[in-house]
Amino acid sequence: MTKPIRRRDFLRLAALGGSAAVTAFLQACADAGIDPATVAPTIALPTPTTAPIQPTADTSPTLVPQEPTMTAPLPTAVPTQTAQDGTARIAFVKTTDRAGGVRQAVELLGINPVAEKSVFLKPNFNSADPAPGSTHPDVLAALVAMLKEMGASKITVGDRSGMGDTRQVMETLGVFRLAEQLGFDTIVFDELAAEDWVMVETPAGHWQQGFPFARPVLDAGAVVQTCCLKTHQYGGHFTLSLKNSVGLVGKRIQTVDHDFMNELHSSEHQRRMIAEINAAYTPALVVMDGVDAFISGGPHRGELASPGVILAGTDRVALDAVGIALLRYFGCRTQAAQGRIFDQEQIARAVELGLGVDTPEKIEFVTSDADSAAYAETIKQALLAG
């Protein structure tokens, strides 16, 4: 059974195509014997006009989904923060104190994109394993506290686990108990209704029929993400901010008979498909917990290292590039350590889609103390060399 089209989506279609588009849409439904109120919306993401490379055969904007289609919603947050010269600022805090490090990193950015907005906070609840297998409770609590101080009108935390039942994972990690203590809402994506998923297609994308993206994320006033620092042994090569967005995609939805996660993890294009998910939304803020890391294995368990760092920024490409440099510096010898960082498929496809900076030279580290500055300079050199 198809999900009903929302009045908001119908009006957006009208605004995009005018009365002629609506008339054509209704006539097509009548010819096919379809009730237009039951047509499921599809979002076709526009080709970015600010992509740092010219369109190629792989990024051609000429491929369009079948009618009816709608353009992507307005960004759920401020655009990726870049300076006038095109650089991305990454706050870099050397610390083993997660709560203090989160606060310091966010303050270093000097931004407040959440004031008076409803905020969706995306953690890493892929499994019930302790950090870096999943988001550390100190990171989650510190972020919620900061978002409240910054004036967020409402905070909702949600995810879809890749390993195990999401509700059970969140229960084991103490998320619901923390929600009661700190006063935030929770969403278990496994339990969303059909109308709470939106099919998204990217230009020249590698998904067979697009992918279902969680509507609560698109409806939020701002999206904040927190990810871990680790490798990924099941084809992703690394799982940082770009890969963390996979939890916003449904495995199965009621209106489509398809296993989207099986498609993703069995595809030779898996890493490109990961990047394409990120074209569906723009985070207002991303915090990476690098106090501990997996330099092999992952995402749930692996070889542990202790980089002792918290990063924050708004550019997912820049953050992930720095994350890969950290993994390499601490001895990673998996596929994430092979080739140039910006040639990694997740990074390269994200750059094609205009999701962040296109060279390591455009990444600026922001620190507040001598130890962090010295550490950042070391990682910067590893980044430039990679």
PLM ranges: what are they?
Residues T2-I5, D9-F25, C29-V39, I43, ...:
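N-terminal and secondary-structure boundary signal
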